[in-house]
């Protein structure tokens, strides 16, 4: 089919925030999107797959300052690292957009001006409760236990001149659209959440500019303002394919918009299903066809966090297991609408049972038997029976089931259907016992037919596997000397050419692993990382009183008894003075009042709090730690912090006012 005649399919991921190296939970989304994009190509669609990086905002400006570089230098490095991970995982994106791209920035300025000129944006003042890491204002009623509803950190009162978007103007229209298009927000649970928690109670006008930091896209007619994150970041989906609000959009935009699928994490679905469609309505641009809020990939029982020692990075996992194995783990373990769990133990189990045994051993055995009994030649002799017909039926049914699951974006279920093909093949070997047939010369045609059926089933399964594990698919097909079969031809069993020769040296696709050896290597790796952190603590970078920067790996340590825990003393401290540590990019030196004492404590939170912000705060302190020398200064305790999956820190503070020195129990 000619390229211009194909149906189009435009898929996007959320653009990754350029604040650091993405962990496997972040990487899951790009792998998921890649599997969908590849499958759509197999279905014959003209696919455009866009991903990229979100590179503006106060947090990046602060992190760049703490690192001693310009914001542009900081995001250049972060974007390169994110792109490296995406490429490592063999993702087939068509465009990697950066919000610092000149054409994107120019278009955002034009969009802002257009919305202002037509009265959708107006100038005013914003006074409310502000969360710096989330770069969001909230009302008192939106807080959860007095904290930011999105990240759980402290908010602080703020007032600033700002531009606002009239959200309420478009709310009735959006509600009507969602009701008329039930497929727009998926899964349905996300739709119900947006309707009941945000749209039906009523929308407030949205702040769309900031004046308290400069690292953003300037409002060209009022340059002391920079465009606020969501009006900048969300528009990448249209600017990346050539949208122009002046009416000069490119042919590419006209070809691919509206997007078929915005694939995003469940934590940002509000911005994509409320803010984004309303912006588009104001621009008179059609809405995307579907927004899918995928669940999180968790390590153990919680969201990944560096300070917990439970962050898994894609490149580390690739070193242990290989690219396709990691792709299999994250795609297979993620349910449709519930969080998935990943661990070293589970990955080794999947490696051994699914990849090495069910798939790898099947391919190796089949090729080896073809070489042993027929000098590598695979021929269909037509000596079939009832068991053969059942094999063929199951294989073709699983193809249909996998296809149906992919239409519903149930990728994990689709992979299960594919592996059911390989499971049925293994059962078929047990049923037909080729080694027994080989002993009887009269069963030679029967043996040949069995091996042909196995090879044909493997060819179908491997071709279907391509969207999820492309390298493995290609390796299998290369070993049986055939090309990838088109999805449209997988409704027929028996297309593998009779008389074809397979490789005489089958490659081991996946080697079995010993869980004990793997965990020992993991422990050694964590130990080396902790040692490196401790060594760094005495150097120019200093060290932190937070768990992350002290090299303390909470998840990696053995369980302790209650008596061990009881040895630690926690008290409320009040910070009465705070200064930046000279020549350190991370450290603040706080004088902390604890009862009648004042202690000096160093903390690696310079990127998140200014010395002025620290003064007066009540914090939680570990007070019976042995004093340590950090960056040439003595630290007499540890101020406790929490850390999110992006590596941002927030002080742990008592919910109610407590006197300095109060014991935490």
Question: What is each stretch, according to the model?
Answer:
Residues 118-171, 175:
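Cys/His-rich short segments
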Residues 2-78, 97-112, 117, 134, ...:
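N-terminal catalytic cores of NTP/NDP-binding nucleotidyl/phosphoryl-transfer enzymes
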Residues 79-94:
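A glycine-rich helix N-cap at a beta->alpha junction
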Residues 2-51, 103-107, 157-372, 414-418:
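Structured secondary-structure scaffolds
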Residues 290-293, 477-479, 589:
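Beta-strand segments within the central parallel beta-sheet cores of soluble alpha/beta enzyme folds
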Residues 123, 346-384, 394-502, 622:
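Helix-rich, typically C-terminal accessory recognition domains appended to large enzymatic cores
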Residues 473-564:
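Intrinsic disorder at enzyme termini
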Residues 536-665:
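Phosphate-backbone binding interfaces of nucleic-acid-interacting proteins
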């Amino acid at each position: 089919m000619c390229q211009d005649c194909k149906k189009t399919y435009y898929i996007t991921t959320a653009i990754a925030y350029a604040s650091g190296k993405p962990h496997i939970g972040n990487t899951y989304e790009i792998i998921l999107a890649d599997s969908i994009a590849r499958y759509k190509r197999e279905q014959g669609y003209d696919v455009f797959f866009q991903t990229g990086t979100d590179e503006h905002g106060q947090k990046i400006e602060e992190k760049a300052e703490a690192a001693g570089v310009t914001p542009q230098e900081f995001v250049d490095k972060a974007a390169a690292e994110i792109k490296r991970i995406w490429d490592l995982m063999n993702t087939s994106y068509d465009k990697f957009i950066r919000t610092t791209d000149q054409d994107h920035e120019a278009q955002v300025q034009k969009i802002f001006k257009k919305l202002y000129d037509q009265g959708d944006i107006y100038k005013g003042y914003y006074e409310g409760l502000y969360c710096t890491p989330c770069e969001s204002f909230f009302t008192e009623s939106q807080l959860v236990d007095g904290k930011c509803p999105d990240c759980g950190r402290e908010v602080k009162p703020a007032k600033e001149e700002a531009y606002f978007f009239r959200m309420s103007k478009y709310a009735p229209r959006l509600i009507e659209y969602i009701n008329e298009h039930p497929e727009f927000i998926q899964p349905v649970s996300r739709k119900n959440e947006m309707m009941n928690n945000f749209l039906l109670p009523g929308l407030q006008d949205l702040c769309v500019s900031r004046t308290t930091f400069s690292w953003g896209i300037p409002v060209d007619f009022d340059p002391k303002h920079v465009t606020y994150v969501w009006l900048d970041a969300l528009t990448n989906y249209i600017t990346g394919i050539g949208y122009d609000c002046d009416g000069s959009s490119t042919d590419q935009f006209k070809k691919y918009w509206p997007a078929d699928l915005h694939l995003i994490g469940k934590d940002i679905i509000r911005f994509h299903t409320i803010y984004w469609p309303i912006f588009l309505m104001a621009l008179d641009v059609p809405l995307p066809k579907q927004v899918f809020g995928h669940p999180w990939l968790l390590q153990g029982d919680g969201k990944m966090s560096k300070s917990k020692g439970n962050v898994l990075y894609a490149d580390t996992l690739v070193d242990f297991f290989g690219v396709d194995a990691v792709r299999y783990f994250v795609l297979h373990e993620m349910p449709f609408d519930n969080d998935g769990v990943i661990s070293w133990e589970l990955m080794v189990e999947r490696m051994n049972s699914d990849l090495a045994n069910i798939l790898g051993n099947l391919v190796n055995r089949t090729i080896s038997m073809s070489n042993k009994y027929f000098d590598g030649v695979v021929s269909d002799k037509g000596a079939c029976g009832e068991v053969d017909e059942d094999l063929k039926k199951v294989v073709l049914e699983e193809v249909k089931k996998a296809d149906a699951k992919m239409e519903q974006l149930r990728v994990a279920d689709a992979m299960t259907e594919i592996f059911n093909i390989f499971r049925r093949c293994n059962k078929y070997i047990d049923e037909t016992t080729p080694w027994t047939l080989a002993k009887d010369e009269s069963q030679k045609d029967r043996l040949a037919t069995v091996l042909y059926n196995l090879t044909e089933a493997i060819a179908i399964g491997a071709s279907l596997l391509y969207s999820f594990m492309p390298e493995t698919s290609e390796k299998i097909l290369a070993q049986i000397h055939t090309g990838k079969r088109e999805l449209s031809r997988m409704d027929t069993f028996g297309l593998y050419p009779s008389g074809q020769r397979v490789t005489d040296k089958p490659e081991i696709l996946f080697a079995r692993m010993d869980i004990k050896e793997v965990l020992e290597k993991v422990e050694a790796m964590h130990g080396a990382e902790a040692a490196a952190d401790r060594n760094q603590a005495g150097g120019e970078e200093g060290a932190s009183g937070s768990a992350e920067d002290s090299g303390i790996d909470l998840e990696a340590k053995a369980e302790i008894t209650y008596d061990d825990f009881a040895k630690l003393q926690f008290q409320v401290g009040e910070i009465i003075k705070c200064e930046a540590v000279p020549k350190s990019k991370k450290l603040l030196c706080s004088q902390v009042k604890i009862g009648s004492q004042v202690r000096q404590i160093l903390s690696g939170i310079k990127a998140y709090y200014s010395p002025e912000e620290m003064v007066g705060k009540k914090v939680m302190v570990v007070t019976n730690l042995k004093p340590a020398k950090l960056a040439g200064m003595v630290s007499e305790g540890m101020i406790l912090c929490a850390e999110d999956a992006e590596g941002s820190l927030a002080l742990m503070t008592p919910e109610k006012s407590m006197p300095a020195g109060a014991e935490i129990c």
